[in-house]
UniProtKB/Swiss-Prot annotation:
Transmembrane segments: none annotated. GO terms for molecular function: phosphoribosylanthranilate isomerase activity. Belongs to the TrpF family. Pfam families: PRAI (PF00697). This is N-(5'-phosphoribosyl)anthranilate isomerase. It comes from the Bacteria. It is an enzyme of class 5 (isomerase). It comes from Phocaeicola vulgatus (strain ATCC 8482 / DSM 1447 / JCM 5826 / CCUG 4940 / NBRC 14291 / NCTC 11154). Its EC number is 5.3.1.24. Signal peptide: none annotated. CDD domains: PRAI.
Amino acid sequence: MIIKVCGMREPENIRAIEQAGADWMGFIFFPQSARYVSHRPEYLPEQCHRIGVFVNESSENILLKAQEFGLHHIQLHGRETPEQCRKLKAAGLGVIKVFSIAQESDLQSAGCYEGVCDYFLFDTACSGYGGSGKTFNWNILQAYRGKTPFLLSGGLRPGSLSLLLQFKHEQWAGIDLNSGFETAPALKDDAAVHTFINQLKQKIQ
């Protein structure tokens, strides 16, 4: 079970969340986000995989950020095409494509990205690009028959543990935590994250 904590920015908070047990850590390179990372922090995680989050960004700029931040994966939240995903994957980056889910038909577009992404991320549909703080109906995902593993996102918070323990899917690979564990934009409650990760990993391997 991959535990990704997204929307990180502040050096000491990065260090604390790394020590709390996160597997992956996300950095948002979308200027309109309240969690936008405008420059390289003084500390970047050494034990976590670094994930760069982009929205409708050019491949050239993505590759530059990947080099600057030592990114392992890129997470694409916009209208990126399967061809762009394929080229970025060929450049040596892990690719995570995000799909906004409100109904079963929203899963159909994922089929075009099979084979060119390492993971999908299913998030709650909203007017913006993620960060809604709301949970969608996870039962919709039982209709997903793809071969690409996925991360579950959208409104996860400390009280979500029981729901996660009930959820089952053979392609479910991990979860994405963000605003539900924040004390302010880009600042995570490391104690809450640590407790949640420990409780989850005791129950799910």
